[in-house]
Amino acid sequence: MSSDKLPESKRVLVADDDPVMRHLISTIIKQQKYDVVVAEDGRAAFRILQSDSAFKAAILDMTMPFLEGLDLIRYMRTEKRLMRIPIMMITAEQDIKLMASSFAAGATAFLPKPFTPAQLQSAIRMLLGNRQLRKIAA
């Protein structure tokens, strides 16, 4: 089955300009039996989201070329077809104000870099589980 025909519940968007980080995050998500669509920068993620809204979750880097993660979150939260997708913001910045800005923009979760694979696995499980809780509450 090709990745563009996968059911909504099995796909996660990963947007990060660091190829090593994209690979690490993608590998961990795939280990949890999800499929991954990657974007190498904010503009690429924006284009993907314009044409495809069938994602279980999105994991976005805060600082990316062409379009910052916060701007991408704001876009997602204004689009009806995207607003319910849980979003995890990741960043190497250790500023509490950035975390607050992420949540204010609409992020569901925040994970500071560096993180261990176990921390990422746990954060992804919580992010994806949060989606199920929202469906029950809706």
List PLM regions with ranges.
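Acidic, metal-coordinating helix/loop segments flanking the phosphotransfer/catalytic sites
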Residues: 38-57
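C-terminal output helix
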Residues: 115-124
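Short, glycine/charged-rich "phosphate-handling" switch motifs in NTP-dependent
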Residues: 108
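The feature encodes the CheY-like receiver
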Residues: 22, 65-66, 83, 95
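Residue-level signal for the "D+5" position in two-component response regulator receiver
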Residues: 38, 66-67, 104
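Charged docking surfaces used in two-component/phosphorelay signaling
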Residues: 23-31
